[in-house]
Design a protein with these regions (language model features):
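Alpha-helical linker/hinge and terminal dimerization helices associated
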Residues: 7, 43-44, 65-87, 287
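Short helix-boundary/capping micro-motifs
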Residues: 11-32
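A short LG(V/I)-centered, amphipathic sequence patch enriched
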Residues: 41-63
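Central regulatory/effector-binding core of bacterial HTH transcription factors
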Residues: 91-154, 222
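A late-sequence structural motif
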Residues: 106, 257-299
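Flexible hinge/capping segments at coil-to-helix
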Residues: 153-192, 197
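Beta-alpha-beta core module
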Residues: 154-160, 164, 179-180, 226-276
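Secondary-structure junction motif
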Residues: 176-177, 191-212, 280-289, 295-304
């Protein structure tokens, strides 16, 4: 019978595409890794790995086995977690992913509140690209994440929490910044800055530019909301910044001017995400509820 250990070794090889690096990742020798994978192939009666390729490639059936192995290993980890936490309540470490366009402006207070309410739990927060973190979540490298929608992925529970308003800001010396009320046609042809194209924010700004008849400045991609604000303040273009960032101590409007635009109601939907059937579902729901409550309080809107 194929063992969980052999499946772990196969997944490691799929991730690293190199026998030595995969062996190091699972703390065994390279010969042991090769021997165990050959034993797995013999047991299944198929070839899983094309060994003459560099980097190592999986056969078509190998890719299918890896996909199933990832799910098996995640399910086993959830069962082990459930057993370890039986009767323990909220405790342990939760690996939490969040987009950098949200985490720094919302999570600090939530983490502190969570630790006060549940002293035996630790929220390990890591920033990343939402679509990439969704894949990490699916394979068990993350336990929970906070992300703008839409989000792609299978076997994920998506819990919408709140809508965050988005605002157009301009260089303070630009002519439209002097107007008490800005019309959409005033922004036709204007250049808009955005995050790099891996972020939801890039796609949303692109769609808004299309709606306004504005131009997305492909040559200027920010790595953070701070960099967007600074580039905008320097006169490089307009930007679209979320409400929580503008309300935060690290953000604000000291370098830019928020525009009062007629007929403007752009926003983004924020959701908590975890694996369907995860052992800690009740804990994740508690954290999601705390995030929703905190966000609604900051934004000054009632819970639905």
């Amino acid at each position: 019978m194929s063992t969980l250990r052999q499946l772990t070794y196969l997944v490691a090889l799929a991730d690293y595409r190199n026998f030595r690096r995969a062996a190091d990742a699972v703390n065994i020798s390279q010969p042991t890794l090769s021997q165990q994978l050959r034993a797995l192939e013999a047991r299944l009666g198929v070839t899983l790995v094309e060994r003459n390729e560099s980097p190592v490639q999986l056969t078509p059936v190998g890719r299918e086995v890896v996909a199933r192995a990832r799910k098996i290993l995640v399910d086993v980890r959830d069962v082990e977690d459930m057993s370890a936490r039986a009767g323990a309540g909220m405790s342990g470490t939760i690996r939490f992913g969040v987009t950098p366009t949200l985490g720094p402006y919302l999570m600090a207070g939530i983490v502190a509140s969570l630790h006060r309410r549940f002293p035996d739990i630790r929220l390990y927060v890591r920033e990343g690209i939402p679509d990439e973190q969704a894949r990490e979540l699916a394979r068990g490298d993350l336990d929970m994440m906070l992300s703008p929608l839409p989000l792609s992925g299978s076997n994920l529970h998506i819990e919408p929490l709140f809508r965050e308003p988005l605002h157009i800001v301009s260089p303070p010396e630009h002519r439209v910044a002097q107007a008490a009320l800005v019309r959409r046609e005033d922004l036709a042809g204007a250049g808009f800055l955005s995050m790099d194209r891996r972020h939801h924010a890039h796609r949303q700004v692109r769609d808004i530019c299309t709606e306004l008849g504005a131009e997305l400045l492909e040559d200027y991609e920010g790595t953070s909301l701070d960099s967007l604000r600074q580039m905008c303040g320097s006169g490089l273009g307009f930007a679209i910044l979320p409400e929580l960032y503008l309300r935060s101590e690290v953000g604000g409007e000291d370098m830019v001017k928020r525009l009062a635009l007629t007929d403007w109601s752009a926003s983004r939907s924020i959701a908590a995400v975890w694996r369907e059937g995860a052992a800690y579902t009740a804990s994740y729901q508690t954290i999601a509820d705390m995030i929703a409550t905190a966000a609604h309080e900051i934004l000054g809107v009632p819970m639905a």
